[in-house]
Amino acid sequence: MKPPPPIEELLPHRYGMLLVERVVDWDPASATVSATPSTQGWYAEAGGMPSRIGIELMAQAIAAHVSIVAWSKGEPPKKGVLLGARAYRATQPYFAAGGELIVKATRAFSDDSGMGAYDATIAHQGAQVAKARILVFEPPDFEAFIASQKQ
C-alpha cells in the first residue's frame, strides 16, 4: 500500500483541534496514528493531556481510517459523527507532555445504515494506557442528518 497523504489532508480539524500528527500504519480494517501531548495545548493540565481527551484521539484515528480507505479508492471521505464511547478505561489521569502516544482504531463492525464501532487503544512506550469501544455513525446524507438534529 502506498503511504497516505499528510494528516491535514485527511482530517478537517484545524488549529488546536487537530490532535493527531500522522498516520503510522493502516489497512482496510484499521488505522494507527500518533499524537504528542503538549503543555501549550488548550487541554493542558498538570503538565500534560487529561486522559479523558483520549476519546477524541481515538475519534480522530477513526476519522483518519475512514478518510484513508476512501482516499485509497479515489473517493471523498464520508462525514460522520461520534455517538459515544463504551468502557473507556485509562490507566493514568494524564498523558505526559512530549511523550508520543500511538492510537490504534480497528473496525469491529459496520452496517449499511452507517452505524459502526471501532475498538481503540492508546499506547505509550509500548504499554497500553487507554482503551474503549467507540460508536460512530456515517449518515447517508450528512447535511440532512445535521439539519434534522436542529429541530
Report the location of each language-model feature:
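HotDog/MaoC-like acyl-thioester-processing domains
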Residues: A96-I102, T106-Q151
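Conserved positions in beta-strands of structured domains
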Residues: E21-V24, T91, T106-A108, L135
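Hydrophobic beta-strand-centered segment that forms part of the acyl-chain substrate-binding groove
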Residues: H65-K104
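Compact, glycine-rich, soluble single-domain proteins
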Residues: A46-H65, K79-L82
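Short Pro/Gly-enriched beta-strand edge/turn motifs at strand-loop
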Residues: M1-I7, L101-V103
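Catalytic strand-loop segment that frames the active site of acyl-thioester-processing enzymes
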Residues: R14-P50
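Hydrophobic residues on conserved beta-strands that form the core of alpha/beta folds
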Residues: V20-E21, L83-A85, A117, V129-K131
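Short coil-to-beta-strand transition motifs
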Residues: H13-L19, A96-L101
